[in-house]
Structures are given as structure tokens and as C-alpha cells.
Amino acid sequence: MRKRPMCLACLGFMLVLVLLRIAGVPLGTPFSDPKYENKAQQGRKVWIAGTIETYEKKSSNNGYVLRGEGSKGKIYLLAKRGDLPVGAAVRVYGTVKKPESPRNPGMFDEKTYYEGKGCAFYVISEREEVVDAGRWNLGEALRLERERCCAVLKEMMPEEEAGVLSAMLLGERSELTEETYLAYQQSGLLHLISVSGMHLMLLGMALRRLLMALHLPKTSASLAAAAGMVLYGMFIGSGTATVRAVVMFAVRMGAVAVGRTYDSLSALSLAAILMLAENPSYLEQSGFWLSFGAVTAISGVYPVLAGEKAERKRRGEKTGLEKLAAKGKEAAMVYLSLQLVMIPLQAWYFYEIPLFAFLPNLFAGAVMTAVLLTGAAGLLAGLASVKAGSVVLLPTRFLLTLLRQMTAAVAQIPGNVWICGQPEKWQMAGYGIILTGLLVILYVRKRKREMNPDGAKRKGAQARKRERMLFGITMFFACVLLFYRPRETFSITALDVGQGDSLVVESGRFVMLNDGGSSSASAVGEKRILPYLKQRGIAALDAVVVTHPDADHTNGILELLELIGEQKTALRIRHLFLPVWMKGSEKENPFILAAQKAGIMVEYLKKGDEIRAGELTVSVLHPGAGEDYTGEENAGSVVLQLSCGACRALLTGDLEGSGEEEVLGAAERCQILKVAHHGSRNSTSEAFLNRIQPQISLISCAWPGRYGHPHRELLERLRACKSHIYGTPVDGAVTVQLKRDRLAVHGYRSDVEFPVS
């Protein structure tokens, strides 16, 4: 570290930023214009004037960063139009919103995402007007050229291959098909479909060699290549990985120009300092940590694990087979180095890990240079002649087709993706300390061997073999520490799904989903329920219970069934339970078809049925066999009584009216009540509450909502029976855990314990 003061400065700078943010100093927080605060809270539609600074194409719309007129702050504009010029003065009319922090564990962090773009608000535009197109703008010229390049690639290649090459060369992921993106993700190759540091380095070095071949002096060629890559970075968009790669390449070329030795870790540290100084919120961005983590693995971890340099390893190797074996060993060591750093980051940000990523990555590493160079050459040729470009791109098409077939094959392997859950912060810290400590020990021993080669030779290969074995055993236990997930004795989590219901019940290894749907949140299964399950490390649901067929209780479940049937998730569902009165009706058809496609068994619940799992007993109190609730589905909701030790909970769906009267005689006193029908005044009567006497009442609804849930009359009844009320509009996701003889309630704004009585 003494020889790398830039690394020390970077670590110190990051530590200061972390401490300041913990202390509440708003570093990296975008300026929040007061004139938009109230309008955002009310969801009002407004006219906003400003100048467009940047543009990015998205899959379903177009994104612009807008600097407001007469304002210090920026606003992110989501518009259907994709032809608003960068640098233009515009007026837009739409709904202004303030990004929210996630209200469920695992949910997309909208606030952090927009902070990374420097925006405190975003506007969903309905109408745009260009007031002044402005003068010639470099950013707009580069955007138009990038769109032209994407169009040319589409002409020269099939859609899938054109989308992949557009992502690799132009940073344009919007051209990727959903199937391609998913296949690369499940094969551990997601880093390839973006402009990474490796891509930029290959293209930059190729440009430098070309300039030197044209007899440009070494210094001039290096500086020109650096300038070219800066322009290329502006051309493809200044993402985290791009900015980091451009800075590192510029430092490398600068070192060549002045005759100094290039040090990748020092260049990496400089890039981190520059980026964090410009926007400290990068510390909370996944792209920042993944990009810098990958380079740290290659530049810092690999040299230590590899021991001697590759050139020294191959000294004396005569045959081509020996050289091939050495290269294979080197590739395996690079992959191991990457995984040691990237696995905890993948677990932290994505909650799942591809288990069979080695072969696709090995193949990709072997062909990526050829893909990028022939792809770039083909694109340049295609800009002059589509036919000529198509010929040049033939090798690229062939290699990308092979890569696509390999990713598709790997994605089909059962158990390819492991849902591991998100580690705790102490687990991440423990893993990092162990890995760093081992690397320091190996580095010190390596230095001693280099300083005393005769002594190292006497000790021989056995000593190094013992070192590797000790390293492997220690890292195995570090991984056990990282992925340890204690099982819940008993817990119920009411997810915040807006106007809807979704409850996750855990007891030991048993996990049950009771309802899952929303009438106010879109894609609730994919964007709220599934991320929570993955964050918790739940790879399989033993039971999914549909209380009744209303969409605000079921559309998320149907999404999960569809994702499983199309093999778009590693989640598994073992049993799907429907109320017995739905059997043979039209309302069961969507569930039957989706379950059959996903290979899931469908069963029916009636009064008297039980599910037992360890200490947990799930008793069905309603509906009875032979009863028909067609036309009054709420009254026919499945009602479950959960018993675990001395703790009981009652899950009621949308129970009301005649259904509530039937349950009244069978229900017992419960500590936990899931309040029926989102807190409607027509459910959970006074007589019902006197029978149940719940200590804790959970309400799932949207606020403000068109139904006015929870109703004042219902809240008064709950307060009258001295029940503690928790609602998803206030607390976000609410979890009730059984801890020995106490119930602990955890929400975003509550953390309380009650004795079980």
C-alpha cells in the first residue's frame, strides 16, 4: 500500500463519504426543488420547462434528463417520443412524482436509481413541445449516429445477434430481446452485453496499434487512442463501467506517453475518486460495485493467487499441449479470482447465482476479442456499404450464434440458478475480512519466496500445495458464513402490494404464500412478490393458497405461474390450493392452465382440511364442502388458522357477510389477525373481534386509494378491542416473528415486541 498511495487515498475517501452519509450529511442527494414537492405528493399534472441534457432509449419508453428552467435541480422525463433533441429547450406536461425507497425487501430501489442520475423527481409525460431546438450539439450528434449504427446492424444481422452486438459495441440494451437478456443472465454472461472495461480496452489498444501501423509516433498514437476512447465513451453513454474504463485507459495511455509504468490498481483508485467526487451516490449503485469489483479481482486478487507471472509459468514448456494446458489453468485462475469477489456482490444485489457459468465464460473469453474486433470492423464497413458489412460480420454472426446456443443450453440445466438470498451486512463484512486476510498472507509469502528463491526451491511444491489447500478450506467456511440463512420458527409477512393482499408464512423449511395480487401496482408478482422471495433466499414455495379469485388477490400468483412455466425464474411451487367451491367453475381455468404448464399440482381446500409442517398446523375453517359462493366470492374466501406452539394467527382473505358468520363459531382466540377485505367497514365485525381478540392486526391496502381503505369504522372497532394496528401504507412490508415466548413486529416505521398470551 505504501507503493500505491492512490489506493490508500481512495479507501480513505470512501470511508469519509460513508461516515458522512451515516451521519446524515446529504452527499450525493439531488437538489429537491420545493415548487415540485407538493405537486409530487399529490400526483398532480404540471407543465415543466427546461433543457434536455442527456437521452437514453428504454424498452418501453424514452428517458431524458431535464434541467428545469430557473432551477438548480434536474428532473427525469419519461416520454413516448424519442426525437426530442439533446440541448433543446422543451415544455412538457405530465404527472410529477418523487422516487420512493423500496417498501418491500428486495424491491427495486427507485430512489437510489434516480439519485444516480442526479434527479430528485421524475415526470411521466403526456405532451411535449420543443420551444427551441438549439444550436448544433455534440451530444445530439452522437445520439443520432448511435441510432444510425443500431439501424445498420439490424439490416446486416438477425434481430437477436444485432441486439447483442448493439449492446456490446454501442451500449444499447434496448435492442435486446427479453429471451436473450434472460439467457445471458442465467448463464452468468450479463457482463458481456454491455460496454465493459475489457471491451473498451480491446478497442482502444486496437486503435493504438492501427495508428502506430500508420507510422504515427508511439506517444502521439497513445494520446490519440486515449482521446478516441473518451469520444467513444461519450458516444455510447457515460455509464458507470464506461466512465471507469475510460479513465483507466486514459491513465494507461498517459503512462505510455510519459514513459512511466502503468499500475491498474492505482488507475482504478483514481477513477473511483473522480467518480465519487462528482457523485457520492455511486456508493449505493450496484453498477459501481460490480464494475470496480471485477477489475479489483483481475488486478488485485488474480496476481496473488496466480503466484508467478504467466510468462514465468510457461518458461520451458515445449509442446503446444503444455501451452494449452497452461492457458486453461490461467483462465481457470482468472475465473476463480473473479468469483471470489463477484459472488458476494451478486448475492447482495441479485439474490441468486448462476452455478454453471464457468464453461460459457471460458468460451466467451476465448472468442470475445474476435467478436468485438470483427464486429467493430463490420459496423464501420456497414456504414459505407451494408453488403460489405454483412460479409465482414459473418464470423461475428457465427460466434454470437454459438454463444447464444450455449447460453440457451446452460439456461435449460435444472438447478442452473441458485436463489441464495441477500446476506446480512455482518456476513458481507466477515467474508471480506477473511478473503482480504488470506490474500495478505499469500502475498507476504509470495514476496518472501521471490526474495529468497533458493529457500523456496528447497521447500518445493508441497508447501505451495498446502497453502492452496488451506486457502480453499478457509474460503469454503467463508462461503458457509456468507450463505448461512437461519430458519424462522414462525413468521408472517404482509407484503406491500398496494391495493391487494400477499402474505408469506415461514416455519422452519416450510414456506406458504397466501394470496398474491394487486389492483393498483403493475406486475406485482414479478416486481414485488418474487424479489421478496429471492431476497429471503426462498427457492421453493411448499404451498400457494388462493383464498378467492379476485384479481387483487391472484394476478401476482398467475404471474409467478407464468414465469415458472416459461422457465424465466428458478423459483419452484410444489402445491397450488384453490377453494373447493371453485372446482369445475370457469374461474379456476386460468389457474389450472398456468399450473399445468408449470408442472404444479392443483388441490382444493375445504373446512376441516389441515396442512402440517413441523410445529406448524394450518387448519382450514372455511369454506365448507358443497357450498357455492359464485357471485359472492368474498364470502367464500378460504380462512386459515395457523398454530405454532402457543401462537395462533387467522388469515381471512376478503371474508365478509355470511362467510364471516360461519367462521365465527369455529375461530379461536388469535394473537395475529390479517384483517379481511383491506380494512373495509363491511368486514371484521365487533362480534368477530370479540371472539378473536387479536393483539396484532395487519391491514394490506393502498393509501390514498379509490376505496378509502382502511375505513374509519373498522379502525375504531380494532382500537376498541385494544389491538395494535399495522398497515402496509404506513409501515411498508410488515413481518410478525415468533421469538420464543414473544412476538416481534418489524416494519419500516415500527419495531415492537409483544408477549404471547
Set out the residue ranges of the language-model regions.
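Cap/insert and terminal regions of metallo-dependent hydrolase folds
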Residues: 575, 660-732
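Aromatic-rich juxtamembrane segments at the membrane interface
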Residues: 116-248, 253, 337-340, 543-545, ...
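Active-site HxH/HxHxD metal-binding segment of metal-dependent hydrolases
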Residues: 551-596, 694
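Hydrophobic alpha-helical transmembrane segments in multi-pass membrane proteins
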Residues: 8-20, 179-358, 374, 421-487, ...
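Core dinuclear metal-dependent hydrolase active-site scaffold
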Residues: 173, 276-284, 408-543, 596-672, ...
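Membrane-interface helix/helix-cap signal primarily in integral membrane proteins
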Residues: 13-191, 526-531, 540, 581, ...
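Metallo-beta-lactamase
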Residues: 541-552, 581, 673-677
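Membrane-interface amphipathic/re-entrant loop segments adjacent to transmembrane helices
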Residues: 134-136, 140, 186, 347-363, ...
